[in-house]
UniProtKB/Swiss-Prot annotation:
Main function: Catalyzes the attachment of serine to tRNA(Ser). Is also able to aminoacylate tRNA(Sec) with serine, to form the misacylated tRNA L-seryl-tRNA(Sec), which will be further converted into selenocysteinyl-tRNA(Sec).
A GO biological-process term: selenocysteine biosynthetic process
Transmembrane regions listed in the UniProt entry: none
Binding site for ATP: R263, R264, E265, E350, I351, S352, S353
Name of the protein this chain belongs to: Serine--tRNA ligase
Length: 426
């Protein structure tokens, strides 16, 4: 959530931020107008309270002078003023709730280092690692490789659950498990604390992390219990410390979790709906940091490098791009996308988004830290995929495929697999 005090003080800052993101600024006008009305109510309340205080002094004087009847008349008048104050304060509370609810729809202002652009075509590439493999045969897409191996079954997934669900068998199922274990092992060696989190969360939890109310249509819900299936472990990890005060000397806190993720993906279309790229249910290893404002953008660089390290160890070519203002996620102040090379697309495809959310989630969740000087400040939260398991599986299948349809297993995964090659199921 944005800082409403800052909006009151400098609405122009938010006008400019929303324009950079290609958002309508009407919501800022609504809040500014509500704030004017709130201030007007506040002035009325303050004047009434001042009048009531004067009457209280008058009552004391009349009683001291023995003028009890006059004192009772003033007390009656003071009571009426108290009722008026309660009415105006009730209106103030209603206005505060309206402003708060509107503010939930305002995205995080982009950081000054984020390039201004209208959409993903204006994202800025900042580095590459590795070279795409030059095949001496016609490579196959994973949606052909997997069924030919007898290990990816899209038809049975559809039969069980509908479109964009998949059943995995044999070595491919084991490889997906191995990828997750490998990622967790690397991240925990790098100082992350592994966390096993709930996959169902309360409405206030998923509101705190920014998915609600704006993205309600993208979420799977359990209406009877008012619970939501997590679209990412970020939700559970970034809400772990709701209503808590952390100590600065214990920051940063670095968490990692492996969970299934559930997304309706209502707006997806085209080539992405084939295979494993855009599923309703997929697995992911998530990275989340709690840190201080002074170091959060420096920490974002480290978090991104931690995600990149997985691809380097797997020997998968990738590039890193900075998202422009028009492509930035709702809660993010700055985001790096890591894109892995996929032969089936003949291009790079997102496998991780690493973001600094600044204090956007912390304000919603009331997550603060006590600084060394004793002051309480909101933490900054960072998040990133470390990595998406399904897309990593796809990248391995396509980049490590052989002419005979077998798949060579990357060296770092062989201890987890107990073999160096995946052959068709018998």
């Amino acid at each position: 959530m944005i800082d409403l005090k800052l909006l009151r003080k400098d609405p122009q800052h938010f006008y400019e931020a929303l324009k950079k993101r290609n958002y309508s600024t009407d919501i800022i006008d609504e809040i500014v107008n509500l704030d004017k009305e709130w201030r007007n109510q506040l002035n009325i309340v303050n004047n009434l309270k001042a009048k009531r205080n004067e009457l209280s002094k008058l009552v004391a004087r009349y009683k001291a002078e023995g003028k009890n009847q006059e004192a009772e008349e003033i007390i009656a008048e003071s009571k009426k003023i108290g009722e008026e104050i309660a009415q105006y304060e009730g209106k103030q509370k209603e206005l505060e709730e309206k402003m708060y609810n509107l503010a939930l729809y305002i995205p995080n202002p982009p950081h000054e280092s984020v390039p201004v652009g209208k959409d993903e075509t204006e994202n800025v590439e900042i580095r590459r690692w590795g070279e795409p493999r030059k095949f001496d045969f016609e490579p196959k897409a994973h949606w052909d490789l997997g069924p030919e191996l007898g290990m990816l079954d899209f038809d049975r997934g559809s039969k069980l659950s509908g479109s964009r669900f998949t059943v995995m068998f044999g070595a491919i199922a084991k490889l997906e498990r191995a990828i997750a274990q490998f990622m967790l092992d690397v991240h925990t060696k790098n100082g992350y604390i592994e966390v096993n989190v709930p996959h169902l969360v309360k409405r206030e939890t998923i509101t705190a992390t920014g998915q609600l109310p704006k993205f309600s249509e993208e979420l799977y819900t359990c209406e009877r219990d008012d619970l939501f299936l997590i679209p990412t472990a970020e939700v559970s990890l970034a809400a772990l410390h709701i209503d808590e005060i952390l100590e600065e000397n214990k920051l940063p806190k670095k968490y990692t979790a492996f969970t299934p993720c559930y997304r309706r993906e209502a707006g997806s279309y085209g080539k992405d709906v084939r295979g494993l790229i855009r599923q309703h249910q997929f697995e992911k290893v998530e990275l989340v940091w709690y840190t201080t404002p002074e170091r959060s953008f420096e920490d974002l660089e480290q978090l991104t490098q931690d995600a990149e390290r997985i691809l380097q160890l797997l020997g998968l070519p990738y590039r890193v791009v900075t998202l422009c203002t028009g492509d930035l996620g709702f809660a993010a102040a700055k985001t790096y996308d890591i894109e892995v090379w996929l032969p089936s697309y003949n291009s790079y495809k997102e496998i991780s988004s690493c973001s600094n959310v600044t204090d956007f989630q912390a304000r919603r969740g009331n997550i603060r830290y006590r600084a060394k000087d004793g002051k309480l400040n909101y933490v900054h939260t960072l998040n990133g995929s470390g990595l998406a398991i399904g897309r990593t599986l796809v990248a391995i299948m396509e980049n490590y495929q052989n002419p005979d349809g077998t798949i060579t297993i990357p060296e770092v995964l062989r201890p987890y697999m107990g073999t160096d090659i995946i052959k068709p199921m018998e």
